[in-house]
Amino acid sequence: TYGKLAISKTGQMLMGWDSEKREFIYADRSLKGAEFEIYADGDIVTQDNQGDTWFKGGEKVATITTGEKAEFTSDCKGICNYSVDENDVVHITLPLGKYKVKEVKTLYGYVFSKDNEWNLEFTWENGQDEFVLNSTEDTDKSGSLNLRNELARPQISLLKEDADTKETVSGAAFSLCTAQDIYNVDGEKIVEA
């Protein structure tokens, strides 16, 4: 019996430009390249009651790169394994025990979340199950850690003052222009400079 976990990472990506509304169009997509580390939260021991230890408490177990791969510090005789599906979800298997998952790197242009650590626990239920899912509240019912990064969005505040009186002038109109062409996530030019 082993623990089974899926990690997915999404965020808004620039898709297009609505010229009538004069606003950018965004959609959620999977984010490839966010990095997570998994640490043993206490000793992770073999299930044969022989006292062999797979990982010591606090030891790094794996580095996960969303949409790409997982690198384990030990394969635990084939228990530690991974696959990546067509939606860029990384599926991993781990020995039973308690773990901490930490996001250590997000993609350029995305806000690194303050909530970047999650607890996992895979506990033995019976000898019939091939795998068990996380028993903490940090994953959904299917054992998936579904995470989202917010796109960093600049905010601009403009205030027009009278040059002589320094009083605020209401109703002033401003234009915001781009010095470079703007492209969407697929590399298509959507706004010309």
Which role fits each region the language model picked out?
Residues 1-193:
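Solvent-exposed loop/turn and edge beta-strand elements of beta-rich ligand-binding domains
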